[in-house]
């Protein structure tokens, strides 16, 4: 098999080979239609003339006429063929793109499927011709139609005639019988073969490969191609060399592109590389352009190299190698900034593709994972590799090579750390800025109060931080895992000393410069399981801790003399980021966003007084970023007053809770004890936060400010006493069932006579009971009441007095009525119920819009056929006044009876409510009195409404 792996420089065709055979078919069909229908059609306007469908429908009708003539002349042969029987309806005046044009094209498609039995594989749709897409199927459909029509005497294009000629040659070679239907056809002159072989050799000889694609001539127009010796038929169609492929045609140029490895750009047509013939493979590399390059074995001598420069060039060969750990380490450790020219990637980038491909054949072992990465390195530009800011060589260091460099001398690994810190400075500045921008803007207010003080200290202590970091950094860097690992793309900077130097330079630039230098790349450290010793720079890269996640441990943040919450929270991040001198330091990470805390075993074992205190001079620039808060304006004296008032109030509240829980509800001792413990803890916290260093007052953590003028005497006494009594029993009152609970006839008189006296007596007893309960509560509590509680009690008393006065007036009016009407009212009240009436809306919509039947009395009906009439006679309305008087009397009596019964039931409910000794009974009495007035108003309204209706009826 040939070993061609390239392509030619110049195209062997005037246009794309995939469209050349379509152009040849279109040219042949245009000439065929021009001769047959005398149309001015060429290749350029082929679609424009046929898109309205009229020419296609005419051609279909013409084929049908030829089929009918053939059936008349050759009836015995017509039985073996499928002939069309009907034509196509068409519209000659159809405009392109209109619905009439679409109808013409649709009729032609249906005729092809039904009458000519053309398969859907080579059929087209209406949209293909209207929108000029899928041109290939349109041309194939016309060729198939011409092929089928040529069987019964229809003139055919040149391609169909060449097909018939080739079929005749095959029949003669295979000694097959001749065609059964010798139908006379109008033939056209075919092209001769005198220039065919010359044109074929011209196309094939353009390949400059040492071993060319074989194409051997068997006879005129017949060749054997490739190593498989496939027999193909070649013909000349005007200016194109056509090849008979399967059931269709193709150009020779396109055929060579698909089958010749020199032209083919697909990986499926590439020959497999054999390990046994490596020496032959090197010399058989195919390129089109020649270039003199130095040889690999002897640079003084030059050799000719063929360089591939075609747009459809094949990809470099993919080599599958087995994994080798030693080779991985040598490849990954060989990339450095100083040895760029000596590295394999740099050499491969300078050598031409020919040498690079030949070099890659000799290697046998490579990791499957590294093949993709090293492939990108081979195709890298040399200038891009030389640039220290953008290159892939930094990302392919293995952990084993990094460990071997770290375990060397201090000079070597400090130099490497300097290189990495300088090359990754832009990334880390961008990362800090992005992390700061993502933080929430709202934080605790007291952290911002210390920000101004920290800024003053930072300028004086920056040099101290650098010196301490240099000393600590050299002692804390250790390598605990030197096992060979897979090459990691994300590198951990090894030297903390240079990082601190870079951190100091970064502080002076400011936050605004960091925002401008944002980059999309990020720096990640390796797993904390594999490498527990982290550097100062990596801790600085972490996300700042939120105040809610700070661990207030007594073993870490307690002072002997003075301890401030502001110092604890402000210097928490610095204690987290400070490297420890001890070798037992461990790093704890709970996630990406959680703070990292260093636990020192030696410090935790020491007593509280011996533990190291947080130093104010160790603040850094990261604290400024964490403490971006807006301070609240407050004086130190105001803070002292606030803390004192809070302490006094909490103490008094705890005492009140203890006293109330012992006297009233001994079951809640545990809850009171828990609240007492909580109060003591809050007292400790408030006392600790009240102490601030350097005479500065801190802001409370909760951010709540209480007025110092407030009296802290009895703040929770009434609330606690009310809650300790338990749930208060309330009386359920159903307003709707008042009328149904009317007493019997005999009890109405007794209730009417004794009603007035009972209300007065009950009112006096209720007031006495209320005064007694209030006095006992005031004596038992012996505490001052809040203004809101006093106002509430006064409001309740006023409500009760007003309700009593209203009830007395209502009862007096009821008793002042005539005693003669009472029996009649009682009789009427037992059988009557309040009339239901709907509330009239403000705007009544049209009856016909609501689709309701209008309930209006019909007018006079004078039609003679409608008898008797629906309109009542006016005589019946003359007796209305006598009826109206009776109706009015009955309604007034029922109204009086309902009023008496409602008042009686209301008094009973009031007496029961007063005896229950409920302080909130005034609210319920107001609720009782309100429905009474509401009941009165609808009745009077109904009475007036009924009168107006009767008056209107009498007027009619």
From Swiss-Prot:
Q: What one GO molecular function would you report for this record? A: actin filament binding
Q: Where is the composition biased (Polar residues)?
A: 332-353, 381-390
Q: Would you say which domain of life the source belongs to? A: Eukaryota
Q: Where in the cell is it found?
A: Cytoplasm, Cytoskeleton; Cytoplasm, Cytoskeleton, Cilium basal body
- What InterPro entries is this protein classified in? CH_dom (IPR001715), CH_dom_sf (IPR036872), GAR_dom (IPR003108), GAR_dom_sf (IPR036534)
Keyword terms of this UniProt record: Cell projection, Cytoplasm, Cytoskeleton
Primary localization: cytoplasm
Identify the residues that the record assigns to the Calponin-homology (CH) domain, covering every copy. Answer: 23-150
Q: What happens when the gene is disrupted?
A: Morpholino knockdown of both gas2l2.L and gas2l2.s resulted in mosiac embryos and impacted the number and distribution of basal bodies on the surface of ciliated cells. As a result, ciliary orientation was significantly reduced.
The reply on keyword Lipid biosynthesis is no
According to the UniProt record, where is the region Disordered? 332-361, 378-406, 853-885, 914-956
Which ranges carry the GAR domain?
191-263
Q: Does the keyword Cytoplasm apply?
A: yes
One GO term of the biological process aspect: microtubule bundle formation
* Basic and acidic residues bias: start-end ranges: 859-868
A cellular component term from Gene Ontology for this protein is:
microtubule plus-end
Its biological purpose: Together with gas2l2.L, regulates ciliary orientation and performance.
PANTHER family referenced in this protein's UniProt entry, alphabetically:
GAS2-LIKE PROTEIN 2B, TRANSGELIN
Give the similarity note.
Belongs to the GAS2 family.
Instruction: Please report the name of this protein according to its UniProt entry.
Output: GAS2-like protein 2B
What's the source species' lineage? Eukaryota, Metazoa, Chordata, Craniata, Vertebrata
Query: Which gene name does the record give?
Result: gas2l2.S
């Amino acid at each position: 098999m040939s070993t061609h792996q390239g392509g030619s420089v110049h195209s062997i065709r005037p246009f794309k080979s995939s469209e050349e055979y379509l152009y040849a078919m279109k040219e042949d069909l245009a000439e065929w239609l021009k001769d047959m229908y005398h149309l001015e059609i060429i290749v350029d306007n082929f679609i424009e003339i046929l898109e309205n469908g009229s020419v296609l429908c005419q051609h279909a009708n013409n084929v049908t006429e030829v089929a009918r003539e053939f059936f008349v002349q050759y009836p015995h042969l017509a039985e073996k063929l499928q002939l069309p029987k009907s034509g196509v309806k068409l519209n000659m005046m159809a405009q392109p793109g209109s619905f009439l044009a679409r109808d013409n094209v649709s009729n032609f498609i249906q005729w092809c499927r039904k009458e000519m039995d053309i398969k859907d594989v080579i059929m087209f749709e209406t949209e293909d011709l209207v929108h000029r897409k899928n041109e290939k199927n349109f041309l194939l459909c016309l060729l198939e139609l011409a092929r089928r029509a040529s069987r019964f005497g229809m003139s055919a294009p040149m391609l169909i005639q060449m097909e018939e000629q080739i079929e005749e040659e095959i029949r003669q070679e295979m000694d097959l019988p001749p065609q059964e239907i010798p139908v006379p056809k109008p033939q056209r002159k075919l092209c001769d073969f005198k220039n065919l072989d010359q044109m074929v050799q011209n196309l094939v000889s353009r390949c400059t490969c040492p071993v060319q694609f074989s194409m051997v001539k068997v006879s005129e127009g017949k060749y054997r191609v490739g190593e498989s010796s496939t027999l193909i038929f070649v013909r000349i169609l005007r200016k194109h060399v056509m090849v008979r492929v399967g059931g269709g045609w193709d150009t020779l140029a396109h055929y060579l592109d698909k089958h010749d490895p020199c032209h083919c750009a697909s990986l499926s047509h590439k020959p497999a590389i054999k390990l046994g013939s490596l020496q032959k493979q090197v010399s058989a590399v195919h390129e089109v352009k020649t270039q003199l390059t130095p040889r690999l074995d002897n640079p003084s001598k030059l050799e000719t190299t063929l360089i591939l420069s075609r747009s459809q060039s094949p990809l470099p060969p993919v080599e599958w190698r087995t994994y080798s750990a030693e080779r991985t380490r040598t490849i990954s450790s060989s990339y450095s900034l100083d040895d760029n020219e000596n590295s394999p990637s740099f050499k491969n980038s300078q050598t031409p593709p020919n040498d690079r491909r030949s070099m890659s054949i000799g290697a046998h072992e490579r990791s499957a994972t590294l093949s993709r990465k090293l492939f990108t390195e081979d195709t890298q530009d040399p200038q891009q590799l030389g640039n220290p800011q953008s290159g892939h060589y930094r990302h392919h260091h293995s952990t084993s090579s990094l460990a071997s460099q770290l375990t060397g001398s201090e000079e070597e690994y400090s130099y490497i750390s300097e290189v990495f810190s300088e090359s990754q400075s832009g990334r880390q500045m961008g990362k800090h800025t992005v992390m700061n921008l993502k933080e929430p803007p709202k934080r605790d207010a007291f952290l911002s109060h210390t920000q101004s003080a920290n800024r003053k200290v930072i300028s004086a202590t920056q040099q101290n931080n650098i010196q301490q970091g240099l000393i600590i950094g050299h002692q804390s860097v250790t390598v605990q895992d030197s096992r060979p690992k897979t090459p990691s793309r994300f590198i951990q900077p090894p030297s903390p000393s240079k990082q601190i130097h870079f951190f100091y330079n970064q502080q002076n630039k400011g936050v605004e410069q960091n925002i401008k230098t944002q980059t999309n790349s990020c720096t990640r450290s390796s797993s904390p399981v594999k490498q527990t010793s982290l550097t100062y720079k990596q801790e600085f890269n972490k996300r700042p801790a939120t105040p809610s996640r700070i661990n207030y441990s007594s073993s870490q943040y307690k002072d002997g003399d003075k301890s401030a919450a502001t110092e604890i929270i402000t210097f928490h991040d610095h204690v987290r980021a400070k490297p420890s001198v001890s070798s037992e330091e461990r790093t704890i990470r709970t996630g990406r966003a959680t703070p990292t805390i260093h636990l020192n075993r030696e410090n935790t074992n020491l007593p509280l007084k011996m533990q190291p205190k947080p130093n104010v001079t160790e603040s850094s620039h990261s604290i400024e970023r964490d403490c971006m808060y807006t301070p609240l304006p407050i004086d130190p004296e105001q803070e002292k007053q606030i803390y004192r008032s809070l302490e006094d109030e909490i103490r008094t509240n705890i005492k009140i809770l203890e006293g109330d829980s012992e006297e009233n509800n001994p079951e809640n001792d545990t809850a009171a004890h828990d609240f007492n413990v909580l109060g003591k803890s809050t007292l400790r916290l408030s006392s600790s936060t009240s102490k601030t260093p350097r005479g500065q007052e801190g802001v409370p953590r909760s951010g709540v400010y209480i007025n110092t003028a407030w009296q802290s005497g009895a703040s929770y006494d009434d609330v606690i006493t009310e809650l300790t009594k338990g749930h208060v029993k309330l009386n359920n009152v159903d307003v709707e069932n008042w009328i149904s609970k009317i007493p019997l006839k005999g009890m109405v008189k007794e209730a009417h006579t004794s009603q007035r006296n009972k209300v007065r007596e009950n009112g006096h007893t209720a007031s006495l009971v209320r005064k007694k309960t209030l006095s006992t509560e005031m004596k038992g509590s012996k505490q001052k009441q809040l203004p809101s509680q006093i106002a509430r009690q006064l409001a309740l008393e006023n409500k009760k007095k007003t309700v009593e006065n209203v009830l007395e007036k209502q009862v007096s009016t009821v008793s002042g009525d005539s005693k003669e009407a009472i029996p009649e009212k009682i009789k009427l009240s037992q059988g009557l119920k309040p009339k239901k009436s709907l509330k009239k809306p403000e705007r009544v919509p049209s009856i016909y819009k609501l689709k309701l039947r209008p309930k209006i009395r019909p007018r006079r009906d004078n039609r003679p056929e409608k008898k008797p009439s629906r309109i009542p006679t006016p005589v019946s309305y003359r007796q209305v006044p006598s009826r109206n008087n009776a109706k009015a009397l009955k309604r007034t009596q029922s109204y009086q009876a309902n009023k008496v019964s409602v008042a009686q039931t209301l008094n009973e409910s009031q007496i029961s409510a007063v005896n229950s000794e409920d302080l909130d009974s005034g609210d319920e009495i107001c609720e009782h009195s309100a429905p009474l007035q509401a009941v009165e108003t609808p009745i009077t309204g109904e009475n007036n409404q009924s009168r107006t209706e009767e008056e209107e009826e009498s007027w009619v």
